[in-house]
């Protein structure tokens, strides 16, 4: 068991590191106006100020999946540290890793690194949707996606408890995750409502 869990932890850390590196690369490509990438061409432009330019990271579906995967990775590191102190790491992290794997599969289908077809590299991008060119675009989506990610640990804890046939365990262990996730998600929704109205 110890060797398998050690390999699983190493694999999870490698996956999370890869997600961090891929996210950093995408952000660097956006800031450097690399319009040969379809996603960057479709959502950014040279005229955007730095804050809005960086927010084009998650302006489209591909980038939103990347942000979601990044947030799930961050929360996963915290969850792994939490479960290492308890006796449910194997089950909980197994379920949580399947959530991360699903998001990674979505990123394979909706690849933010897809190149524009043909040999012509555009001089400028199409730019950010005018409705999204707002200060709140820089704050609202990351908070919202962190809230989404924070709701995954209670699910993993519940399924892990079912796998162990310890049906009450997950309630107390997931309470802090539910409250914290609800607060972050509530803040994100409130900011979105403020932005919309």
Residue map of PLM features:
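Polytopic transmembrane helical bundles with strong interfacial aromatic enrichment
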Residues: 1-197
């Amino acid at each position: 068991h110890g060797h398998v869990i050690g390999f699983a932890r190493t694999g999870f850390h490698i996956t999370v590191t890869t997600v961090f590196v891929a996210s950093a690369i995408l952000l660097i490509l956006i800031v450097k106006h690399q319009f040969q990438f379809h996603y960057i061409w479709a959502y950014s432009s040279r005229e955007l100020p730095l804050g809005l330019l960086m927010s084009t990271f998650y302006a489209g579906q591909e980038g939103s999946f990347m942000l979601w995967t990044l947030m799930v990775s961050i929360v996963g590191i915290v969850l792994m540290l939490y479960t290492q102190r308890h006796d449910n790491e194997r089950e909980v992290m197994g379920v949580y890793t399947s959530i991360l794997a699903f998001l990674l599969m979505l990123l394979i289908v909706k690849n933010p690194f897809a190149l524009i077809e043909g040999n012509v590299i555009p001089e400028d991008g199409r730019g950010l949707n005018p409705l999204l060119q707002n200060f709140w675009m820089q704050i609202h989506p990351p908070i919202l996606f962190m809230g989404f990610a924070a709701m995954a640990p209670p699910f993993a804890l519940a399924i892990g408890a079912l796998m162990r046939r310890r049906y009450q365990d997950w309630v107390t262990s997931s309470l802090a995750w539910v409250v914290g996730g609800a607060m972050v998600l509530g803040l994100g929704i409130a900011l979105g409502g403020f932005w919309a109205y």
